[in-house]
């Protein structure tokens, strides 16, 4: 199992140079529908901090963060502070990890997800615009619509143990922004499984 997870990690971690969205520049705008049928545009959230999370519960790294409830706790903590948190699920319909909107809503309820919305990005348009390569792969956008962080959720690429003991980059970056300060960390290497795009 360890060997399989190591292969997943080594084979799917993206080079920062491959990211389509650049830290320090305006985040790519997008329009996407969530699993309830509501349309979301990034530009609608100007004036708010936005977190994008590349999500697929078929990945053991994602399971690790959600089974521990650490991800839901962070979502609740930050959304209560006015942060917008969007899950981006770019799994194409032909893959076994694909969720219909109905199945996604059940998964949302069963896991107790506390994000703002789950974007049903089956075309991969949002994921590719940001260069999302792994699940999870995190992005933080400031109130001016500028991408200020992209990379891993934390500094511990693991599937066991307590993620709360890791250094959580997303919490750190968002809290810096909320305090009116410049984040110290702006890019890290994301870890996890590959995003299941159609091509």
Annotate each language-model stretch with its function:
Residues 1-4:
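Positively charged n-region of N-terminal signal peptides that target proteins for export
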Residues 7-17:
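Bacterial N-terminal signal peptides
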Residues 18-28:
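Cleaved targeting-peptide boundary
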Residues 30-50:
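A short beta-strand-turn-helix
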Residues 43-63, 174:
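Short active-site neighborhood of thiol/selenol oxidoreductases, capturing the structured segment around
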Residues 63-111, 122-129:
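Structural microenvironment flanking redox-active thiols in thiol-disulfide oxidoreductases
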Residues 105-142, 147-148:
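Short, internal strand/loop/helix patches
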Residues 140-199:
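Thiol-/selenol-based redox modules, centered on thioredoxin-like
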